[in-house]
């Protein structure tokens, strides 16, 4: 009798194991929708994050206000930047540090750097937008495709430009939204593919500091300045109350990786 029970239990266990092996792998992340909470008064953002990670890389709209405390609201149709820090679910806005925006135009030196960067804010449709855990992508109306992902301490940007356009990127260390205020910025061109710097601000924290290193997959020429653009040469450093950058990758390739 004991032998019979042992054999039955063994066959039952083998049967259960076989069933489990035949089951399709269940990907729980397929049920996650990062756009939940980005409309109404949800105050959430749809960008790329990791659990307990130090980077929240997500699109920003060019608006202030209670519904834009996360930087993004689903009712909007303009993206002003992809910045690296965000708050989610809060009723007050802050962060949105180190703003990137791929552009397909050359700089207009007849206007201020701030005005030029604002002129590059891009229209988009939610039909061309996608988000899943750790990943975000969008195609602007001007044809530029952006894909975002993250590691614990690094934001990863992949840009694909129309072949017949400028292949460039603006970096905004100055603009602050809602209750944030920029107090000091610094940028240094280390070499043809590397920048380093910081942004200091006041908001929830009286003295917030974000230090960064930016690496590109292609050589670039850089214009930088607060009130006007000037060439930023290798080894040169600019420190001011604010700074805007225009990074030109030339025409060797229309696919750029930045991190």
What are these regions (language model features)?
Residues 23-259:
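Accessory carbohydrate-recognition regions in carbohydrate-active enzymes
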Residues 1-24:
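Bacterial Sec-dependent N-terminal signal peptides
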């Amino acid at each position: 009798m004991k032998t019979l029970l042992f054999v039955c239990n063994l066959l039952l266990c083998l049967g259960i194991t076989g069933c489990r092996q035949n089951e399709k792998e269940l990907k729980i992340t397929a049920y996650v929708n990062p756009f939940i909470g980005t409309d109404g008064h949800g105050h959430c953002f749809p960008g790329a994050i990791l659990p307990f990670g130090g980077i929240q890389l997500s699109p920003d709209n060019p608006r202030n206000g209670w519904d834009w405390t996360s930087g993004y609201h689903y009712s909007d149709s303009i993206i002003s930047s992809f910045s690296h820090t965000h708050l989610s679910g809060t009723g007050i806005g802050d962060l949105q540090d180190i703003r990137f925006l791929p552009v397909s135009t050359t700089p207009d030196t007849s206007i201020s750097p701030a005005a030029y960067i604002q002129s590059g804010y891009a229209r988009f449709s939610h039909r061309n937008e996608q988000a899943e855990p750790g990943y975000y992508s969008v195609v602007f109306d001007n044809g530029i495709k952006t894909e975002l992902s993250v590691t614990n301490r690094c934001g990863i940007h992949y840009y694909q430009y129309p072949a017949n356009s400028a292949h460039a990127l603006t970096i905004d260390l100055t603009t602050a939204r809602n209750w944030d205020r920029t107090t000091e910025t610094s940028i240094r061109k280390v070499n043809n593919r590397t920048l380093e710097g910081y942004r200091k601000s006041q908001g929830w924290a009286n003295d917030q500091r974000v230090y960064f290193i930016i690496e590109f997959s292609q050589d670039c020429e850089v214009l930088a300045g607060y009130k006007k653009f000037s060439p930023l040469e290798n080894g040169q450093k600019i420190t001011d109350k604010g700074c805007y950058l225009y990074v030109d990758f030339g025409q060797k390739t229309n696919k750029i990786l930045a991190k």
